[in-house]
Amino acid sequence: MSFRKSNIYLNLLNSYMIDSPQPSSINYWWNLGSLLGLCLVIQICTGIFLAMHYSSNIELAFSAVEHIMRDVQGGWFIRYAHANGASFFFICMYIHIGKGLYYGSYRAPRTLVWNVGVIIFVLTMAAAFLGYCCVYGQMSHWGATVITNLFSAIPFIGNDIVSWLWGGFSVSNPTIQRFFAFHYLVPFIIAAFVIMHFMALHTHGSSNPLGVTGNLDRLPMHGYFIFKDLITVFVFLFFFSLFVFFSPNTMGHPDNYIPGNPLVTPASIVPEWYLLPFYAILRSVPDKLLGVLAMFGAILILLVLPITDRSVIRGNAFKVFSKFFFFLFIANFVLLGHLGECHVEPPFVVMGQIATVIYFAYFLVIVPVVSTIENVLFYVGRKNAK
């Protein structure tokens, strides 16, 4: 027996990363998992080095970021790698979720993998919001004010929760300090859930583009798919480097280069681009409490897909109607992202409300109805074939 199999620790690594049998038909959409792991490593490593030079005191936070940029050797690279790493993390995560929606990765027996993935998604959004506030630029201050104020929509105890979160009567020094503490902690919680995600995936193995269970036509992870992953890793690093070195502020907001000022309200308060679709849903509902419920519901509704999808065939590879509505959903999601950065004025308000209805209808109406129709067509076609 080889040493990698006889050693208790190396055997665990071997079963997950070397000899793990993978479907031979998986394509490059299955490489997003390794890219997300790379993004998480980049974020944790750059975040640790940034924390060495950052001060969470509200009087020093903005200056500390400028100190990192100007005085720390290589500080500009660490800061830009961390900021753009967050954007690339969400790019990969949205594509990964889209792949899961298209190929039915949420279907049994991989429902647990999907549910843990949704938890990782929520935690990543929380970490991104907390980190955005730590810069304490103008948009950071007002973004923190708006988002934390959402808890005031909770009946009876909402205002008390907001004051408790702030540590005072407005976003102040205790707020930024506790946000930084949680921002440092959450990535390690995400890493723990990533391990759980990996363990749940290892139980039944990866799905495949065909949507069928094939335990015979498989190849070992190392030698085949490790090399395949490396191709997309280098492509990712190429585009990541383009942004870090040549256009580091493209995915940021210019107002965040102004120190946070509670006396001056920006013309438009918007979060980072990767939170815009859900921000648009929040703004599309006139009632504050219902808007908050809609925003959080838009994220957690991913958990209902294993229940609402009634199709007997996993994935959309061979389903024409499901393909059409899936791409309609993607276009609608992109539209929500654009509407999230627009001013609250006609016609954007009505467009946001229509896009919000379509978003929820996809999960609660379109998927179950279309999957049922396709089931009927499948059984009729199979009966006629006999």
Curated annotation (Swiss-Prot):
Gene3D superfamilies in the cross-refs: Cytochrome Bc1 Complex, Chain C
Additional free-text comment from the UniProt record: Heme 1 (or BL or b562) is low-potential and absorbs at about 562 nm, and heme 2 (or BH or b566) is high-potential and absorbs at about 566 nm.
Predominant location category: mitochondrion
Similarity comment: family membership: Belongs to the cytochrome b family.
A Gene Ontology cellular-component term: respiratory chain complex III
A Gene Ontology biological process term: mitochondrial electron transport, ubiquinol to cytochrome c
PROSITE patterns: CYTB_CTER, CYTB_NTER
Any one GO MF annotation of this record: metal ion binding
Biological role stated in the UniProt entry: Component of the ubiquinol-cytochrome c reductase complex (complex III or cytochrome b-c1 complex) that is part of the mitochondrial respiratory chain. The b-c1 complex mediates electron transfer from ubiquinol to cytochrome c. Contributes to the generation of a proton gradient across the mitochondrial membrane that is then used for ATP synthesis.
Keyword terms: Electron transport, Heme, Iron, Membrane, Metal-binding, Mitochondrion, Mitochondrion inner membrane, Respiratory chain, Transmembrane, Transmembrane helix, Transport, Ubiquinone
Transmembrane segments: 32-52, 76-98, 113-133, 179-199, 225-245, 289-309, 321-341, 348-368
Cofactor note: Binds 2 heme b groups non-covalently.
Protein name listed in UniProt: Cytochrome b
UniProt subcellular location: Mitochondrion inner membrane
Subunit relationships: Fungal cytochrome b-c1 complex contains 10 subunits; 3 respiratory subunits, 2 core proteins and 5 low-molecular weight proteins. Cytochrome b-c1 complex is a homodimer.
CDD domains documented for this protein: cytochrome_b_C, Cytochrome_b_N
Cofactor section: heme b
